[in-house]
Amino acid sequence: PIAMAKKMGVDVIVSDHHELPAVLPDAYAVIHPKHPAGSYPFPDLSGAGVALKIAAALLGEMPFESLDLAAIGTVADLVSLTGENRWIVKQGLQVMKQAHRLGLAALMEAAGIDTAVLDEESIGFIIGPRLNAVGRLEDAGPGAELMLSFDEEKIAELVAYIQEKNVERQSIVQSIHEEARIQLAKNENLPDVVVLGNKNWHQGVLGIVASKLVEEFGRPTVLFNIDEKTGIAKGSARSTEALDIYAALADAKDSLTKFGGHKMAAGMSLPAADLAAFSEKINNYAARYHDAIVLGESIYIDAILPLADVTLPFLKELELLKPYGTDNPKPIFGFQNVPLTDIRQIGADNKHLKFKLKDKELFLDVIGFNKGSISNHLNEADVVSLIGELSINVWRDSAKPQLQLRDIKNKHVQFFDKRSSVIQESVLAVEDALYLF
C-alpha cells in the first residue's frame, strides 16, 4: 500500500512502536522511538504515546487535554510503565477524573467506575476491554466516535452498543477458552510453546484467550483462526518472562507470511498447511529456554509484614508508587505463620476464595480470584504462610485493607471432617491425603 501511494504522489508517514523490521518502509517519514537514525531518550512508548508526541510536535506544545486517550492506549498496550509512559498515565488519569470528555465519562459511569478511585486498573480491566471489544469483534469506529462526540443522545447510543459488544466478547472468550483447555488437558506433557488452531475461533479475541492460557498453564501460547476459504491461519501469541516471543517468531520466519509484535505479545499469519511445521520450529527454538519455561514465573517478595503494619495510612503511602504495570509491578508482601478464619467461596460458580487472616484482635481480608477450589484444602484456624498484593478495598463508603492472594502454603498436618450422605468429587481430588471412612 505504501509503494502504491508513493507511486500516486501521496506522501505517507508511518508511526509505530513495534519491533522494527530489518528493512524500514519506503515512506516519506517513519516515526518510531527506536528508529536507528534517531536518539529519542525513551524507547518504550506505546502507539498512543507516539501519536501524542506527533501531536505535540505539530502543535508546538503538549496537548494535555489528550492525555486521557494516551493513558488508555499506554495501559491497554501493556508497555513498560516506567519513564515517560509512567508520566503519561499518571497525568492522563488526572485528566480522566476531570470528566471533560463526555463519551469517556458516560462509559465510565455505565461501567460503574467511581472517578474518586479511578486508577490504572480501571483502564486495564474495565475501560480498555470495552473499547477493544468493538474493534475485536467488528469495527473500532464506534469507540473513536464515542471519544469525540458531544451529542448526549449519540453518546448514550454508543455506550449501550459498546457495553453490548463487551458482553458478547466475554461470551466468545469463555467459549474459546473452554475449548482450548479441553485440548490442553489431553496432553500429559505440554510443549514449551502451545500452538492451537480452529476454524471457528474468532481472530479478534485470540490474544485475550492466549493470555488466560499462559496464566493457567504457564506456557507461551499461540492461537490461530484458520480460514478454510483462503487457507490462511492468523494468530496471536502471548508469552512468559522466559521466552522472547518476537525473537522466537523471527527464528521461524521462513514459515510465516508476516509477523510483528513485542517480547511478550505478537501477531502473525501463515498458510494453514504449515501450522505443524511452524509449531515444530518455534518449539525447537524454545527448547533452549526449556528449564526457565517449565520453572514458571518467579515472584519477588518485597517484604514480610506483621498484620499490625497493614494500616490505611501505610497503604495510602504505598499508592505513591502507582501507576503499576509492566516493569513497575505491584509490591508483593508476605505473611508468615498466621491463623486464618471465615473461609468461603464467593462469586459465580464459587470461582473465588475469601478468608481472613487473624492475629489476636487484628484481621486482614484476603481475596483469591479464580482460586475458589483452594477452600477444599483449608481449615478454620489453619496456620498458613502466604504472599499477595495489598490494596484499599472501598465498599459502601467503607475503606479497609485487603490482600489479593498470589500463593499460599500450609506446612502443618490438616484434618478435614467431610462427613455427608454424599461424597463430593472434590474431596477425593486432594493430593497427599489419607482418607478414613
Q: Where do the language-model regions lie?
A:
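Short glycine/serine/threonine-rich phosphate/pyrophosphate-binding segments
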Residues: P1, G47-A48, Q203-I208
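N-terminal small/polar loop signature for handling phosphorylated ligands or for N-terminal nucleophile
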Residues: P1-P25, V30-P36, S171, S175, ...
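Structural motif
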Residues: V10-I13, Y28-V30, F42, G49, ...
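Fold-independent oxyanion-binding glycine-rich loops
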Residues: S15-H18, P33-H35, I54, I72, ...
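Short gly/pro/ser/thr-enriched loop/turn and capping motifs at secondary-structure boundaries
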Residues: H18-V23, A37-S39, E228-I232, L243
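Short alpha-helices
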Residues: D26-A76
